[in-house]
């Protein structure tokens, strides 16, 4: 793991394995370690590149930044490591960034995997969930809030109680607010038809944050896209159905 200055910001980047590059982007409020459950096995086939996006994990945390900054950072990482073309995988917020990258530089994305995505939003899906259930979570800390709302996030709450860190954050309230603000008013729908990469869109059947209809919409708008629905997952298929998820990803990337 190394801190590297990209676009004037120190980003914490980890590279593992050999083969074709596969860049993975994590969720809102999270960090790259949450992707280890899939990045580690995938590193047997690919050179996996994970990083803490700006404002997250061990990367630098500016007071303000935008979704475009995240997009530029991915392209900056590719430039820094002389990666002309890559496989790109994004999860939740990471899928928003991945869509932006594939639109901005379609010639640089060989294959694209969008996990529990949406193509547009007034704010983050997590923030919307908090607002919808404001009375239910009133007075609760972040951990208590996640426990209360877990039934809206996943299919099997019993299994996911062992992986609560997927939805929790080590950001301060101010840092989390900045991360949410970066996702204000984005809409990729008119530009999705310009994506040229073969694309796999994966949604969880029981996802109340970014439901399958959001993934299906994206798959219809991207010319060379296929849609897969995880039957026993909510918003965390990489944890809820890890083996099935890896099989889908490996089959798609290795074919």
Residue ranges and their predicted role:
Residues 123-125, 142-193:
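Conserved alpha/beta-hydrolase catalytic His-Asp/Glu region
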Residues 9-60:
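Conserved HGGG/HGGXW glycine-rich cap/lid loop of the alpha/beta-hydrolase fold
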Residues 233-246:
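Catalytic histidine-centered segment of alpha/beta-hydrolase-like enzymes
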Residues 195, 201-203:
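Short beta-strand/loop motif that positions the catalytic acidic residue
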Residues 40, 49-89, 247:
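Active-site loop/oxyanion-hole signature of alpha/beta-hydrolase fold enzymes
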Residues 206-210:
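Acidic catalytic loop of the alpha/beta-hydrolase fold
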Residues 99-104, 110-139:
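Flexible "cap/lid" loop of the alpha/beta hydrolase fold
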Residues 90, 94, 98:
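Gly/Ala-rich beta-loop-alpha elbow adjacent to hydrolase catalytic centers
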């Amino acid at each position: 793991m190394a801190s590297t200055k990209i676009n004037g910001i120190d980003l914490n980047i980890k590279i593992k394995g050999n083969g074709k590059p596969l860049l993975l982007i994590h969720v809102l409020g999270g960090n790259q370690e949450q992707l280890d459950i899939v990045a580690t096995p995938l590193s047997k086939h690919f050179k996996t590149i994970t990083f803490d996006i700006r404002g997250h994990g061990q990367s630098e945390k500016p007071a303000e930044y935008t979704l475009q900054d995240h997009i530029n950072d991915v392209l900056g990482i590719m430039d820094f490591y002389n990666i002309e073309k890559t496989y790109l995988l994004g999860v939740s917020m990471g899928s928003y960034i991945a869509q932006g990258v594939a639109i901005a530089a379609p010639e640089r994305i060989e294959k694209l995997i969008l996990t529990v995505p949406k193509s547009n939003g007034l704010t983050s899906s997590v923030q919307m969930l908090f607002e919808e259930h404001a009375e239910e979570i009133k007075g609760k800390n972040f951990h208590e809030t996640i426990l209360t709302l877990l039934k809206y996030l996943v299919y099997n709450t019993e299994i996911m109680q062992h992986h609560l860190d997927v939805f929790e954050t080590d950001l301060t309230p101010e840092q989390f607010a900045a991360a949410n603000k970066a996702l204000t008013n984005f809409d990729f729908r008119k530009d999705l038809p310009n994506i040229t990469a073969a694309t796999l869109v994966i949604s969880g059947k029981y996802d109340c944050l970014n439901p399958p209809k959001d993934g299906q919409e994206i798959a219809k708008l991207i010319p060379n896209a296929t849609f897969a629905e995880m039957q026993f997952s909510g918003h965390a298929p990489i944890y809820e159905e890890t083996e099935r998820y890896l099989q889908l990803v490996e089959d798609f990337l290795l074919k």
